[in-house]
Swiss-Prot record:
The keyword ATP-binding is annotated on this UniProt entry: yes
Protein name per the record: DNA repair and recombination protein RadB
GO terms of molecular function: ATP binding; ATP hydrolysis activity; ATP-dependent DNA damage sensor activity; damaged DNA binding
One matching Pfam family: Rad51
Record keywords: ATP-binding, DNA damage, DNA recombination, DNA-binding, Nucleotide-binding
Function: Involved in DNA repair and in homologous recombination. May regulate the cleavage reactions of the branch-structured DNA. Has a very weak ATPase activity that is not stimulated by DNA. Binds DNA but does not promote DNA strands exchange.
Record-linked InterPro entries: AAA+_ATPase, DNA_recomb/repair_Rad51_C, DNA_repair_and_recomb_RadB, P-loop_NTPase, RecA_ATP-bd
Residues reported to bind ATP: G28, P29, F30, A31, T32, G33, K34, T35
GO biological process: DNA recombination; DNA repair
Family (UniProt): Belongs to the eukaryotic RecA-like protein family. RadB subfamily.
SMART domains in alphabetical order: AAA
Organism in which the protein naturally occurs: Pyrococcus abyssi (strain GE5 / Orsay)
Lineage: Archaea, Methanobacteriati, Methanobacteriota, Thermococci, Thermococcales
Record has NAD as a keyword: no
Length: 229
């Protein structure tokens, strides 16, 4: 069973949507739509959402705007979300552990946005701590049959001249599906499927951020017949 993203292209890219029972990692630079994506999955699907907001990125006003723009009851939408706001890595660990008793069959989604915010602040010695938290999240996904979205940030790797996900190997071991978000041009973002359990890697989908949240970018065919974004 999957949860729709509300974006046809992303659902197809992910093999039907965000899967229950596994962890989806979504990473990319600032302002590429990662938080909006996570909020939208929670908004558009049945069930409660446990949302661990480590960076203060969750906005009730933004969620209400998304709901109203889609003709949904904003207060009802907001009531689905249970928000946790850890201030450091230790509190984050306690909250994630607490989710084992908080998450019931009424929940469909767990979000950690972002998992690595406090990890970055406290240094690279916290690999083991992150691995333990991911182990709990993996248990939640499997035992509670929920989808788990882990948002991750990036750093600049001077050796490869590229942006790489923070704690790449630690997260990569536990996250079965990985989406990378990028800025394509003004008003347009792209999602790249870096890893999936059964879908081919490297697929790309373009999307835009609007009052509704995120939406498909329609391809327009110019006179030469070639498709451009």
């Amino acid at each position: 069973m999957t949860l729709t993203t509300g974006v046809k292209g992303l659902d197809e890219l992910l093999g039907g949507g965000v899967a229950r029972g596994v962890i989806l990692q979504v990473y990319g630079p600032f302002a590429t739509g990662k938080t909006t994506f996570a909020m939208q999955v929670g908004l558009l699907n049945e069930g409660k959402v446990a949302y661990v907001d480590t960076e203060g990125g969750f906005s009730p006003e933004r969620l209400k705007q998304m709901a109203e723009s889609r003709g949904l009851d904003p207060e009802k939408a907001l009531s689905k979300f249970i928000i946790f706001e850890p201030m450091d890595l230790n509190e984050q660990r306690r909250i994630i552990s607490k989710l084992k008793t908080v998450v019931s069959d009424k929940f469909s989604l767990v979000v950690v946005d972002s998992l690595t915010a406090h990890y970055r602040a406290e240094g690279s010695r916290d690999h083991v701590e992150l691995a333990k938290q991911l182990q709990v999240l993996q248990w939640l996904a499997r035992k509670k049959n929920v989808a788990v979205i882990v948002v991750n940030q990036v750093y600049y790797d001077s050796n490869t001249n590229t942006l790489r996900p923070i704690a790449e190997h630690t997260l990569g071991y536990r996250t079965k599906d990985i989406l990378r978000f990028e800025k394509f041009r003004v008003g347009v973002r792209l999602a790249v499927l870096e890893r999936h359990r059964f879908r081919p890697e490297g697929g790309i989908v373009y999307f835009k951020i609007t009052d509704k949240g995120i939406e498909d970018v329609l391809k327009a065919k110019p006179e030469n017949g070639e498709e451009n974004i």
